[in-house]
Amino acid sequence: MGIVMLTFNEYTTISNNCSDNKQLSDAINSVCSAALEESSVISHEIKNQAAYLKTCYQLLSSRNDELRSNKFWNNMGSTIDELVNYLERTSIYRYSFKQSETVSCTLSDIINNINEYIKSRYNGLIALDTSDISLECSSASIYASSHFLNIALKEIIDNAYEAASERNCNKCILILSAIMSPDIKDQLILSIGSKKTNNGSSIYQPDNISSCINNDINDNNCNRPGLKSKLCKPFYTTHKGHTGLGLSIVNQICLLSGIGWNIVSDNDVVTTVFTFNLQS
């Protein structure tokens, strides 16, 4: 079964047609339900087999000293780890297609969740800088699916860390900036990016976030040609070594949650910009 990724225009067209045609809506829902159920069963079976393979590998390694010093055996272990990780991320991608309840949460809640994730996964390898976030933005109520939003933000953090690691940084510094939209009422703009430590900060700061949203994402002046179209393709990521579906997970979650997002690039530093509707 192939993976199909809809663009925003395709998604909007289908949604509009479904709202006017109940038979079409029922038919699409029936096909989607059957496809999701089938893919879920197959995916779980493959994951179970991969987990069993990894367990067997670890058991053999623990009982044989010669195997642990064998280069080819160790390479096989790395491949098994990548396979298991890939299957886990594929499950997240499939899960991101589900509808989720939209609730009220604050930017402060989001920051706390990000900090917890960084502490548990990276153990001091990432420093989070939130000094540019004002009290007004921190306490603002965002109307979104906090559960799916956390998944999307984890993907962005992982991408930012790997991109920083590629530049041989000893420590990744993530910059979080937030402003109220100067153009649209009741909208919050949040940017996440990694600081380029060797040449100072190349991150988008609050005073130029709003301008970069409308300009830098265009293919003509973005350092990564065709970036916009690639966001709708499965397996695309800003980092070549990233395992799994990366930014496609973020794109799908934002699409279903009504969250706007763009990627901007400056001096090989990639910044992700989210736009949230505030709860009135």
Which role fits each region the language model picked out?
Residues 1-34, 202, 211-226:
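Conserved signal-transmission helix
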Residues 11-27, 31-38, 42, 46-85:
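Histidine phosphotransfer helical core of two-component systems
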Residues 49-56, 69-125:
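Conserved DHp (HisKA) dimerization/phosphotransfer helix of two-component histidine kinases, i.e.
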Residues 95-100, 137, 141-144, 238, ...:
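Conserved micro-motifs of the catalytic ATP-binding
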Residues 186-239:
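Glycine-rich/acidic phosphate-handling loop/turn and adjacent ATP-lid/helix
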Residues 246, 250:
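Short alpha-helical Gxxx[C/S/T] motif in the catalytic ATP-binding
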Residues 254-255:
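Detector for a conserved hydrophobic position within an alpha-helical segment of the HATPase_c
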Residues 258-266:
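Glycine-rich ATP-binding loops of the HATPase_c
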